[in-house]
């Protein structure tokens, strides 16, 4: 007879657990606000023995944040659950994804959802057949492309493998070590260059150490969502500069800070130049200088600025993303020493009209300042996810 072993109502039937937790944990996004721990467990226990389950809640309101985690006793149970997609709980289709290990949270592409795999470290004797033979166990392969020099035809030592689903790629990355013909290979998620630029890495929507779409905060709060970490007086793309940031930071309009440094898409002034036709010393591109675009405002950020969380405030809701600087994990603040993916906080919702602003933006006073609170967009707080 199974015995209850923790406050979340999780059970342990004495089954020996030998695999790392990272291989047995599943992130569940897009949960209905009515879904409880018991409801989540009741659905997913059809595919295996669940040893831990939690629906993440706002610590103040106790309202569901729209996502949770389940941990199975064996990794193959994750495969069973993923093979049974789509999953519908309380009338809502949810989005399960293998949880990203805590130590990889800082990696900008760790939580990216992609179907293509980069395989490096290949020798000349590694051909398409051996790659297919090895990786077919993870999922259905669509194509294998071993890259060769256009002029000489010589193999360049790497290849791209595309699957019909994102889950095989996530599973391969979690396994860490892969060897073919006694050669250890370097496997990574294949991210298009333009997507890497958006997620951090020296360009749009982020910069060095930006962590992708908000280096230090959760799409907002502290450092600038959709922008860089401490990108003050520097010139950030899509947010960051001068402490402000887009999508729900205290100040900043979809890019651009309150002052000091300039960035793209509606800078308020300051030194340096940014993209989209910004000019140093004051005016930013796309209706800069004073009022902010997409809703104007001198210091209040459109799309849910001034501390309020755009797109649903502190509640995570259905608009979660995992590809920004880490992906799904929980923090120890929620009990049981579990790492957490998105920080708490909240307050205020985006897309709310306000009386502040009146700049030259696309809509004057519309879409300004999403209510009070210190939480950032999509979950406030001051932790990296």
UniProtKB/Swiss-Prot annotation:
Transmembrane segments: none annotated. Residues 319-336 have a biased composition (Polar residues). Its main location: nucleus. Residues 199-289, 305-317, 344-362, 369-385 have a biased composition (Gly residues). GO terms for molecular function: mRNA 3'-UTR binding; mRNA binding; poly(G) binding; sequence-specific DNA binding. GO terms for cellular component: chromatin; cytoplasm; heterochromatin; nucleoplasm; nucleus; omega speckle; polytene chromosome puff; ribonucleoprotein complex. Residues 24-101, 115-192 form the RRM domain. GO terms for biological process: compound eye morphogenesis; female gonad development; mitotic cell cycle; positive regulation of mRNA splicing, via spliceosome; regulation of alternative mRNA splicing, via spliceosome; response to heat; response to starvation. InterPro entries: Nucleotide-bd_a/b_plait_sf, RBD_domain_sf, RRM_dom. Keywords: Cytoplasm, Nucleus, Repeat, Ribonucleoprotein, RNA-binding. Gene3D superfamilies: 3.30.70.330. It is found in: Nucleus; Cytoplasm. SMART domains: RRM (SM00360). The keyword GTP-binding does not apply. Residues 192-289, 305-385 are annotated as: Disordered. This protein is a component of ribonucleosomes. Could be needed to organize a concentration gradient of a dorsalizing morphogen (Dm) originating in the germinal vesicle. This is Heterogeneous nuclear ribonucleoprotein 87F. It comes from Drosophila melanogaster. The gene is Hrb87F.
